[in-house]
């Protein structure tokens, strides 16, 4: 390569510092690098972006796989990778994503903390339904293209703030995503342990090697239950989180304490699970005779004859073969009764959740949140938006007012071109137009905790 050509190439290469203003707008940091809230310097648009600087120099093969996959995924409910920058001078890699102001981890935490008040703020029924429908829509797109997400949890479900996509769900963190149409090896051989413990399907905990899209459906069921109750349904103490052994006694015990021990007729293939002998040695069926999902949800005031409960049962079916698919779930009667799902999960109402705050260069990570993050997942992952977030370990903490973060980035995914255009499979549950937004304007660059506090929800109208 000639010198003149190198000079010309360097001059033509886009530099992230020339295109975006992000100094002093750091919203996250971790072992993966740093994340900034950014705006274009040329003013071509007024959008907010998430700009992630990957730690270290150059780009790893795992990051290449993730980027290759992200560049092929195009769906309204999947986070969008806008651009990749490579700084020639210091060999730093920058990823540009859509910026999401909120995520389910902090939304649920906000409502959970309100339970200490005399008038707790429950997630409105319409908002829960819209969130679930959009999650299913995004996952159906991934599954239709043979992509398993493999790490669904509230921290990886982003929600857009004020702007053109207000209230739209974005599934993020494709770090563990894998193509499943024709793997050369069992997926369990590629990654022995996937999915954060609380959202891990029972077949994974029992060592399944050829797991399927059903693992994502189980995780969605866990998220749905958490939206309905503001509590993680299968919360348990985290131990030995770095082990490569998928079997986890405490997590299985928590599942059985909620669901009951699976009957042979309800999960015939459980005997084929690699860890079945360990399961039968460690557990006694009669210990969980009085445990059932009905009893658990009734404690949280979810009626067993409601359509919401019936759908939850289908999502949390123990046998992965009998577990409902994303397409079937989108066609469930739950989505056909009022209130219908909307494209803006806030349904045009004022958003009550605090915005993210900026971090100073010297500001340490919040110790409590950092401890929770380490307990929940042992290491950091990459989410699509490049934000940092906390798994839902500390389910008794108050609402996030300081150092709010969404999920950290890693990269361990396979990337191949998607094979088919995606069509919405459920015309009967199309989003409803919520009408003009009645929310108050918010600063486009604000991360302060001075966002207006919400009025009490009206439990009749389910509005803020």
UniProtKB/Swiss-Prot annotation:
Catalytic activity, EC: 2.7.11.22, 2.7.11.23
Keywords: Activator, ATP-binding, Kinase, Nucleotide-binding, Nucleus, Repressor, Serine/threonine-protein kinase, Transcription, Transcription regulation, Transferase
Residue ranges of domain Protein kinase in the record: 21-335
Primary localization: nucleus
Active-site positions on this chain: 151 (proton acceptor)
Listed Low complexity bias regions: 373-390, 447-464
One Pfam entry name: Pkinase
Span list, region Interaction with CCNC: 1-15
Catalysis: reaction(s): L-seryl-[protein] + ATP = O-phospho-L-seryl-[protein] + ADP + H(+); L-threonyl-[protein] + ATP = O-phospho-L-threonyl-[protein] + ADP + H(+); [DNA-directed RNA polymerase] + ATP = phospho-[DNA-directed RNA polymerase] + ADP + H(+)
PROSITE patterns named among the record's database cross-references: PROTEIN_KINASE_ATP, PROTEIN_KINASE_DOM, PROTEIN_KINASE_ST
Compartment(s) of residence: Nucleus
Residue ranges, annotated region (Disordered): 360-464
UniProt superkingdom: Eukaryota
GO cellular component: nucleus
Cofactor requirements of the protein: Mg(2+)
Ranges of compositional bias, category Polar residues: 410-426, 434-446
InterPro entries registered for this protein in UniProt: CDK (IPR050108), Kinase-like_dom_sf (IPR011009), Prot_kinase_dom (IPR000719), Protein_kinase_ATP_BS (IPR017441), Ser/Thr_kinase_AS (IPR008271)
Residues annotated as binding ATP: 27-35, 52
Gene Ontology MF terms: ATP binding; cyclin-dependent protein serine/threonine kinase activity; protein kinase activity; protein serine kinase activity; protein serine/threonine kinase activity; RNA polymerase II CTD heptapeptide repeat kinase activity
Function description: Component of the Mediator complex, a coactivator involved in regulated gene transcription of nearly all RNA polymerase II-dependent genes. Mediator functions as a bridge to convey information from gene-specific regulatory proteins to the basal RNA polymerase II transcription machinery. Mediator is recruited to promoters by direct interactions with regulatory proteins and serves as a scaffold for the assembly of a functional pre-initiation complex with RNA polymerase II and the general transcription factors.
Quaternary structure (record): Component of the Mediator complex. Interacts with ccnc.
Homology family: Belongs to the protein kinase superfamily. CMGC Ser/Thr protein kinase family. CDC2/CDKX subfamily.
UniProt name for this protein: Cyclin-dependent kinase 8
Organism, as annotated: Danio rerio (Zebrafish)
Upper taxonomic lineage: Eukaryota, Metazoa, Chordata, Craniata, Vertebrata
Gene: cdk8
């Amino acid at each position: 390569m000639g010198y003149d050509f190198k000079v010309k190439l360097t001059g033509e290469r886009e530099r992230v510092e020339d295109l975006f203003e992000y100094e002093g707008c750091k919203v996250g940091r971790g072992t993966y690098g740093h994340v900034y809230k950014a705006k274009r310097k040329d003013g071509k648009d007024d959008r907010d972006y998430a700009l992630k600087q990957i730690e270290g120099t150059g780009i790893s093969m795992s990051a290449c796989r993730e980027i290759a996959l992200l560049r092929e995924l195009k769906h309204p409910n999947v986070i969008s990778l806008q651009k990749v920058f490579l700084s020639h001078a210091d060999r730093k890699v920058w990823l540009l994503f859509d910026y999401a102001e909120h995520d389910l981890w902090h939304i649920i935490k906000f409502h959970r903390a309100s339970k200490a008040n005399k008038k707790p703020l429950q997630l409105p029924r319409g908002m829960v339904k819209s969130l679930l429908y959009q999650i299913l829509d995004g996952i159906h797109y991934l599954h239709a293209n043979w992509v398993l997400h493999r790490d669904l949890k509230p921290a990886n479900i982003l929600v857009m703030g004020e702007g053109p996509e207000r209230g739209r769900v974005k599934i993020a963190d494709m770090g563990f995503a894998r193509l499943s149409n024709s793997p050369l090896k069992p997926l369990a051989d590629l990654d022995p342990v996937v999915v954060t413990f609380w959202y891990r399907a029972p077949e994974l905990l029992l060592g399944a090697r050829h797991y399927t899209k059903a693992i994502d459906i189980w995780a969605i069921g866990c998220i749905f239950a958490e939206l309905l109750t503001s509590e993680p349904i299968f919360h348990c103490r985290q131990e030995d989180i770095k082990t490569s052994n998928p079997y986890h006694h405490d997590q299985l015990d928590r599942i059985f304490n909620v669901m009951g021990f699976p009957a042979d007729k309800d999960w015939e293939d459980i005997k084929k699970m690699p860890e079945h002998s360990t399961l039968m040695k460690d557990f006694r069926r009669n210990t969980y005779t009085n445990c059932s999902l009905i009893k658990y949800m009734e404690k949280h005031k979810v009626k067993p004859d409601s359509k919401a409960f019936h759908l939850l049962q289908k999502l949390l079916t123990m046998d992965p073969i009998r577990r409902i698919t994303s397409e079937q779930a989108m066609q469930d009667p739950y989505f056909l009764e009022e209130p219908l799902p909307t494209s803006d999960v806030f349904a045009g109402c004022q958003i009550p959740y605090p915005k993210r705050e900026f971090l100073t260069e010297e500001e340490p990570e919040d110790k409590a949140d950092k401890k929770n993050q380490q307990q929940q997942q042992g290491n950091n992952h990459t989410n699509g938006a490049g934000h940092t977030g906390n798994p839902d370990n500390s389910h008794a903490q108050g609402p996030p007012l300081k150092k709010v973060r969404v999920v950290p980035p890693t990269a361990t995914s396979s990337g191949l071109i998607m094979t088919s255009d995606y069509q919405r499979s459920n015309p009967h549950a199309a989003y409803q137009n919520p009408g003009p937004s009645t929310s108050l304007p918010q600063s486009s660059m604000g991360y302060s905790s001075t966002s207006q506090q919400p009025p009490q929800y009206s439990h009749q109208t389910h509005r803020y």
